[in-house]
Regions:
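Cytoplasmic helix-loop-helix junction between adjacent transmembrane helices
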Residues: 107-147
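Intracellular juxtamembrane helix-capping segments at the cytosolic ends
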Residues: 34, 115-129, 306-319
């Protein structure tokens, strides 16, 4: 844990990390908030689901573009405009009528204007710390973001029931704008400049490390979302039990990230972490005792954050600075696509075979994710696995420039 203590002593690290997590908090609220609000307006879960899907599509399509703009035009103008447009769109949806066309349009606009904070901050991490500190910072970020998916849905549900269904959307708009402003003020000493590189849009996808990270994270997120469907189908008779079960997996991911994420994880360790996810997921489908199911879910979560942080670190080391934001934008889009694919496949499997169908889909997807690094390594060397700038760099990292 010393690696994390060294991190918090670096001036600005805590402020930057906390501000970007706060600004991204609405991502954990939006899906449920929009579902509850649109269903209340229209009386249709189908229409509400379509608007939520429109948000996901807008974000998946636009994120690589806005992330690239942050690297080309500058972080401050890109994030500022995106936050203002996204916040205004959320407010518009909160007070819009029940017109399906208007709601769908606002859904796409909300998704397309989500500030590319994740790509930007992960491209900036190597500028904040050096040597082993980068590894620990990626681990801390990946682990801490679990809080978004724990706090967000709870906050959305509470506000919708205690105040109104518009309340979580209004809060999301405020947090997006204020959180982005906080992040920009916190990161101002980094002086992010406009990238000088001239690579064409999408060229970063020719990098084998980026492809590996994107495909693996897509499958891993798809597995987790499919598992959520299986958990709800199996334990959904009591909403509290299902929610607690999902939280147990998230706690496992958080603990796994804290204990393992900052360590030197090569390809073999990444495969082992992904295999743990697959094994834990499969065990959840096999055991029929609630306590054992919780243990299996905790075990499945242990490998999630360490594997994701290692993949992000590989990409950070491998891609050129001027392509970093776009690369992480593609990873974000891959994760969004994975979530949609996992949920859809698990839904079909649940209709046909019950909860075991969704869990089987989740286990298969996690197994495929574990195979990806092995296939990539068999095809040739994977860049970014080792630090080319020398692991000898002292972990006592300099303050932000």
């Amino acid at each position: 844990m010393r690696a994390y203590l060294d991190l918090v002593r670096v001036p600005g690290v805590v402020n930057v990390t906390a501000s970007q997590l706060f600004a991204r908090l609405p991502l954990g609220m939006l899906s449920l908030a929009i579902l509850l609000h649109v269903q209340g307006l229209s009386g249709s879960y189908a229409q509400a689901g379509a608007v939520v899907a429109a948000v996901s599509v807008g974000q998946a399509v636009a994120m690589p573009v806005t992330a690239r703009l942050a690297g080309r035009l500058g972080v401050v103008p890109t994030l500022s405009v995106a936050a203002l447009v996204s916040g205004a769109s959320m407010l518009a949806l909160a007070f819009a009528g029940s017109s399906p066309v208007l709601l769908m349009t606002l859904g796409v606009l909300i998704g397309a204007s989500v500030p590319p904070l994740m790509p930007v901050v992960r491209a900036l991490y190597p500028k904040m710390v050096a040597g082993e500190g980068v590894r620990a910072l990626f681990a801390l970020d990946t682990t801490a973001q679990e809080l978004i998916w724990v706090v967000g849905p709870v906050g959305a549900t509470f506000l919708a029931s205690a105040v109104s269904t518009a309340a979580p959307l209004v809060l999301s708009a405020a947090v997006t704008v204020l959180g982005t402003a906080w992040f920009l003020l916190s990161a101002r000493r980094l002086h992010p400049g406009v990238a000088a590189g001239r690579s064409s849009f999408g060229r970063v996808l020719a990098n084998r490390t980026v492809i590996l990270a994107m495909v693996t994270s897509l499958l891993l997120v798809a597995s987790f979302m499919a598992l959520e469907v299986g958990i709800v189908a199996e334990l959904g008779r009591d909403g509290v039990t299902a929610g607690a079960a999902i939280a147990v997996a998230s706690v496992g991911s958080l603990i796994g990230g804290l204990l393992l994420g900052h360590r030197r994880l090569g390809i073999a360790w990444v495969v082992a972490a992904l295999a743990a996810v697959a094994i834990g997921t499969a065990l959840f489908g096999v055991v029929d005792n609630l306590a054992l199911q919780f243990v299996a879910l905790f075990f499945s979560g242990l490998g999630f954050a360490p594997a994701m942080s290692a993949l992000y670190l590989f990409v950070s080391r491998e891609v050129a600075e001027h392509s970093a934001t776009e690369a992480f934008g593609w990873l974000n889009s891959g994760a969004l696509v994975g979530g949609a694919v996992g949920t859809a496949c698990a839904g079909v499997a649940t209709e046909a075979h019950g909860s075991i169908g969704a869990v089987t889909v989740a286990a298969l997807l996690a197994t495929l994710a574990a195979c990806c690094p092995l296939v990539a390594r068999a095809a040739g060397p994977i860049g970014g696995v080792t630090d080319r700038t020398a692991d000898a760099v002292s972990p006592a990292t300099p303050p932000m420039r």
